[in-house]
Amino acid sequence: MPKPFTKACKKSDISQLILGVCMLGAYWFTPSASATCDRPSDEKALLWGDLHVHTSYSLDASVFGTLATPADAYRFAKGDPLTRTDGSTVQLDRPLDFVAVTEHAEWLDFTSICDSPSAEGLADCDNLLTKRSPQNGSALFGEYVVTTITGAEPQPLSLCVDDPELCEANALSRWQSVQEQTEAAYDPCTFSTLHGYEWSHTPNFRHAHRNVIFRSDSVTKEAIDYIRFPTVEALWDELDATCRRDDQCEALTIPHNTNMGNGISFELTQASPKSLQQRAQYERLIEITQEKGTSECLPSRAENLSEDCEFELFLTRQSRPTDPDAFTEQEWQQMRSTYARSLVGKGLAFAPDEAPLRMGFIGSTDTHAATPGYVDEASWSGSALAGTGFDASIRSNAWSAGGLVGVWAEENTREAIFDALAKREVYATSGPRIGLRFGLNEDDAELCTADGWMPRATMGEVTQITSKPMFTVQVQADITPITSIEIIKLTYRDNRAHEEVILLWHKPEGAALACIQWTDEQFDSASATLWYPRVKERTTPRWSAVQCAAAGRCDEFPQMDATLQERAWGSPIWHIPATD
């Protein structure tokens, strides 16, 4: 297999100080999928994908006029153009390597019925089919989406109360159709499709959704929905019962938009041993960036917002954008508790054999326009959930273009990609395809000078460390140069996680390549600790600034962010001390 970094630096180039940086002669191969599959080896390929995609089969996409199908979404991910609701055509500048279409399980029945001959004479289908459009989307969203999943308890649509057998049959047939389209698009060694769907838990507008991703074509017979299975424990119990390893079925449940969760779904003080075990098994990842904002971190107090955590924030109350000063101290702390950094910090309290909240990081788009991987700030014109046209999209300018997930996999097959996800050898980006490796050096070995990548532990791994650890961060820029590399360190002591942001390297003019070695001189082997890298690009124009400039109307939006600093977040490496 090709080597991502080969002879990046001569040994003489590495600084004798704790921090060593070299950017001469490095190169990064784009893996050949066919060679990877034909000649498996210890080297891994960096693959790019999107694990959060909606099409017309999701009701919240359909009401805004999305007509594209899962098959259309897969073709778009492979590089084909797609015509959107407003008649414009979009296309990726580079194909993706893998995609999962994750339709909302709750409305597979309704969208199927309304797309079939059964729709004739049904008032709800007539209402949807005649009105669905960017202009009417918000009203239809309130009529059908809000009424089913945002109350204290989920409620089925009236259509399914009146005729549950019709809805059950259509939910099954629609899920089967998604599977068939997913199988038809699968091209092992070139393009992988993963089966999945979204469980849409939203009590009282508090967001605790999970994307369910499967390892193979052995999947649950039904798409598990929030209406029938209204708690995360019920979701896991149903997966335990219907997705068994003996039947070659394995799944992950990936939470997203924890920035909109207001603290729910991650309270562990009253959790049963069974629930803790299920969380450790199923929730090995968290989606930390997508079109509804970034969920990496919040500071301890709202007035302390700084560059550390103030990237693409999307603060909400009952799913509506809200300013930081609108929250009480208690509300702020509750909201902060479900951001990714707080969650993995809380997970440091658990012993090696109990690993809830030990999660790696991914990004995806959450597109509702069947456009996986479409994250280009220069051409993205707003979320499909905002409507079309400048005025509609700019009203929702707090939304983001979305992210991607980078996976270090043995080969481009769904099983190999799933295994990398389960091992957390993955990372998130806010859109750019930034090359990133993060490893714990073996006995202070010089990974920057090595022919291959052979760390003692790599991103996503749990280990036990007895001496001051040396880490290596290898980075290759995408299109925009890299300007800084940081390590975020969390240390568990005095019953809480203490956070540090450590700047390893900063080059304002930017660079295309970097390899950094850093020793943690403050390491305490008695304390559970994690480290993850964060890489930032040079500042570039944000999509909203591009759109308002094209319209000649930027002066109307003086508070709108004009730029952003795109970035990548590596999954952590954990040190968990042995217990007696």
Spans of features found by a protein language model:
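The substrate-binding groove and active-site-proximal loops of carbohydrate-active enzymes
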Residues: 59-64, 158-172, 218-230, 328-338
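Alpha-helical scaffolding segments of alpha/beta enzyme cores, especially the outer helices
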Residues: 72-75, 173-181, 234, 238
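N-terminal signal peptide c-region/cleavage motif recognized by signal peptidases
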Residues: 28-30
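N-terminal secretory signal peptides that target proteins for export/translocation
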Residues: 1-12
